[in-house]
Structure formats: C-alpha cells, structure tokens
C-alpha cells in the first residue's frame, strides 16, 4: 500500500487545529455557542474545548490566573481565546500573544496576559488587524468582540487559514498591559513569608496564595509541623490560627485546616472536606494579605 504524504504550509506546520475558549459569559445564554459556531464556520474540523466560562464577571485578574493554571499543559500550537472584556468597544487593543512554550492567546490586552507574561513567558505579541481579521459586516457591532474578532481570529489561526504573522503588526513586549501582582516578602528575623490570597480553588473553597513553594521553603518547613497563619483584609485581622503543613488533605481530620502546596506550586490553605473561604469569610485579591510564620 502506497501512503500519500500531505505537504503542510508554513502556517499549518505548527498549528494543531485545537481551540480553547475561556470567558466570563457563563452558559445561561447563547454567547458561548455563538463563538463555537463562528469557529466551526471557519473550519468544521477544528477541535473545540473550554477552559471555563465561569470567570467572575469583569474579573480580569481571575481570567489571567486561569490561563496561567492551564496553558502550559496544552500542546504546542494550541490557540486560546480568552474574553474577559469589561472595556469592550473602547480603544483597548486586541492582540494575539505567543508563549514561550508555543501556545497562542487571543484576547483583549487589558491585563489578561499578566500571569503568563510573568511566570510562563511571552515571546511575541501582535495586534489584531481588524480590517482583515474580523467577521464581515460586523463593523458596527461594538459589544461582542468575543464572537466577531477573537473567536474568528483564533479559529483562522488554529485552522492555518492565516499565519501568526498575518494576525497583524508586531508590538513591543513592553506594551503588554499588566495587573498588579503581590510579590512575596520573606522576613528572616520574623521567620515569616507574606503574600496575598490570589484566587480560590472555587469548587472546594481552598485559598490559593501568591506565595510560591520556593518562597515558602525559605522557612525550612517540615510536614506535620504547625505554622501561625494570619489573614488580613484591608489591614484588619480576619483569621489567625496555628495550621499544620501536610502533603494533602486526608492527612488531617475531616473539618481541620491545613497548609499544602497546590497544583501550581503555590501555598494553599484548605479544610479537609470543607470550604476554608466560606468557613472564615475570606475573599481574594491584593487587599487580602496573608502571613505564614514559623513557630519556635
């Protein structure tokens, strides 16, 4: 049997026809389905997937973090369309970023690229040329760029209809809009590390902090040992207790709190089979500070 080898164009050679959507749209109306339909009109053989559509409305930081949590695990050539866009219809830029590991992010440049740029690495940025990369006859539509610009451009890129260079002009990486990220503070005299509550492990109510594993390791932590955990909201103490550090949840009794290293190698705080966030009314963001102190 003679096999025929398919010759790929430059654009097809590194695109894998995989498109992953993220948004704050939810699934209660037709917005997500409309984006899927636009993508399949471009190429019915595209493989469509969904990161989440339950980003808290308008929460750009959360959208940025979920990309950081996910992108690195997808194959090179995967295209992500992320639409958390409270500035839709304004003069904020629409871009496609290429990551160090070869994935592409189609998004408004409004801070959504913050965590990828800081922790994974973005190597190239291009502004979407909407005179070419926009659905026809949508020029007077100002409130659904997720469908008309981002899903359309993402699908064309994933399908190999356009090359990355054909997205639009290259922009300096210094143009990337970034949100504030709290840096970990290590206090040798106090034997403590300080950061903030970045985000929740939403379904289970665990806190995911900004304190990296390496930063936490400056305390020379030991499994089974207790550490003083203090959480502050607007500089007011919201929680303080001695919490045990363990590998995972089942190593403490049901209903007990623990410190652990989560799946993105940050310090997490959880309750075994319970919600820490709900139990102690803890939120997320730079105004929710946390201090972990070694106890002599």
Report each predicted region and the residues it spans.
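N-terminal amphipathic/basic-hydrophobic helices that include classical n-h-c signal peptides
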Residues: 1-13
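Active-site histidine-anchored catalytic micro-motif
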Residues: 18, 30, 42-48, 62, ...
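N-terminal beta-loop-helix "entrance" segment that forms/cooperates
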Residues: 50-70
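Anionic-ligand-binding alpha/beta catalytic cores of soluble enzymes and soluble regulatory domains
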Residues: 138-223
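A conserved acidic, glycine/proline-rich C-terminal tail/linker
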Residues: 207-281
